[in-house]
Amino acid sequence: MIPAGTQASVAPATPRNVPNRGGEPNPSAAALAAIFGDRIVRSWVNCGETNVVVKVEAIHDVIQWLHEDHGQRYEYLVDVTAVEYRDAGRPLEVVWHLRSLSFLRFLRLKVELSARGPLMVPSVMDIYSGADWLERECWDMFGIKFEGHPDLRRILLWESYREGFPLRKDFPLRGRFSRAEQLKQALAADPEARYSMEELT
């Protein structure tokens, strides 16, 4: 739940090796630190855009507050995506891009997940209905599960695809079977039986 009247004693620090390349920080970052305290890991400005890393257990509450608070009003979910780095020591990131049309602000939120742990974050479909296909694409390409999503299934690949998740760094660069075999599997998947004609067109 969103705490009432809590304040952070120390502002989140800029992470090492991330340049602060000018631009004023989005005031929402300071507001988040004041409201959510140590559940905000850190924040920084890069190329004029404010980035905020949030603990995974708080991300739904943070996004809900940004959407509903009259001083924030982030009405538009621009994108949900993920990033996996070549450095095995770096966590996999789930990224939400939010925009406030009322206050002309942009905010990038991130959650860090260990590639060796469960890749799961809460769905925000109950806040933004437009998150539906964005979350499904993250599941399809990265294997990130969005807890609470009512229909989490593949959206770009066929449902019976078993080769893994194509945007992960451990995805094989060479297929284990021919393009003809892939086509055969795709045709056998019978997408019309699982998807509406509206989705297919």
Language model features with spans:
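Terminal low-complexity/charged segments
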Residues: 1-201
